[in-house]
A protein has these predicted regions:
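Amphipathic alpha-helical polymerization modules
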Residues: 1-163
């Protein structure tokens, strides 16, 4: 028997990270919609490009050495028990639009939410396929599987404090 068959595929771990990231980003984007009338409000987002680069590097490392290694960055930190903390960043483009063209600002936020939702749905479907989960499994079931016992450990203290 091939010993590699006993090692779980790291694709599932990457998909779980994507699902967690998209949930955290959804919260931030919702704040951007709900707090537009707050004086001095600064729209934020999660560092999407940075997160994609971290995942690309982890997958490249996996292909080279058969181990999945997530490296911390200035705004993304990986911890024990599969946790990650992400520092939201100010969204200067959104801030500018909020000041000059509120309709464009709202459209930007809605488009980001739609893109984020699509990314989440794709990752969930791939995870279902990867893990052999039955097609009838609901999003709630996936969320329970992904979040574990303490989903708040997947966000940064800065993100939690902002909510």
């Amino acid at each position: 028997m091939d010993a590699r068959l006993l090692i779980p595929d790291n694709v599932s771990e990457v998909l779980v990270k994507i699902i967690r990231f998209t949930e955290l980003r959804r919260r931030i984007l919702h704040q951007n919609l709900h707090h537009v009338d707050q004086p001095g409000f600064t729209p934020r987002d999660l560092p999407v490009r940075e997160f994609a680069e971290v995942l690309s590097e982890a997958v490249a490392e996996h292909l080279r050495s058969h181990r999945l290694l997530f490296r911390d960055t200035a705004t993304i930190t990986f911890g024990p028990n599969n946790t990650m903390q992400i520092q939201p960043v100010a969204d200067s483009r959104a801030r500018s639009l909020l000041r000059t063209d509120r309709d464009e600002y709202m459209e930007l936020q809605v488009n980001k939410l739609l893109e984020n939702s699509l990314n989440r749905k794709i990752a969930q479907e791939l995870l279902r396929h990867q893990c052999g989960v039955c097609p009838g499994m609901t999003d709630g079931d996936i969320n329970e599987t992904v979040a574990g016992d303490n989903s708040s450990t997947d966000s940064s203290p800065h993100l939690d404090a902002a909510e």
